[in-house]
């Protein structure tokens, strides 16, 4: 089922994209190509293929969960451009 311009406009709206009509046509064509490729991938026989979650075979060692000495509040706040002594002061955005 080909993707229509209306479908592409709906997806663009959901993604908060503003697209012109000519770009919507191109977007619809690209989405159609992606979905066609997904159908091709879905038709591949993978019955005898073992699932592969990562091509890397090494294991990630776990570190010991022990408390370590952390920086003090004063050391951390020393790097901030503005503080009130206990907290970072940041500019108001809204």
UniProtKB/Swiss-Prot annotation:
Classification via SUPFAM superfamilies: Glu-tRNAGln amidotransferase C subunit
Keyword Protein biosynthesis belongs to the record: yes
Catalytic activity: L-glutamyl-tRNA(Gln) + L-glutamine + ATP + H2O = L-glutaminyl-tRNA(Gln) + L-glutamate + ADP + phosphate + H(+); L-aspartyl-tRNA(Asn) + L-glutamine + ATP + H2O = L-asparaginyl-tRNA(Asn) + L-glutamate + ADP + phosphate + 2 H(+)
Enzyme class: ligase
Nucleotide-binding found in the keyword field: yes
Protein keywords: ATP-binding, Ligase, Nucleotide-binding, Protein biosynthesis
Task performed by this protein: Allows the formation of correctly charged Asn-tRNA(Asn) or Gln-tRNA(Gln) through the transamidation of misacylated Asp-tRNA(Asn) or Glu-tRNA(Gln) in organisms which lack either or both of asparaginyl-tRNA or glutaminyl-tRNA synthetases. The reaction takes place in the presence of glutamine and ATP through an activated phospho-Asp-tRNA(Asn) or phospho-Glu-tRNA(Gln).
Complexes and interactors: Heterotrimer of A, B and C subunits.
HAMAP family according to UniProt: GatC (MF_00122)
Protein name: Aspartyl/glutamyl-tRNA(Asn/Gln) amidotransferase subunit C
Species the sequence originates in: Solidesulfovibrio magneticus (strain ATCC 700980 / DSM 13731 / RS-1) (Desulfovibrio magneticus)
Lineage: Bacteria, Pseudomonadati, Thermodesulfobacteriota, Desulfovibrionia, Desulfovibrionales
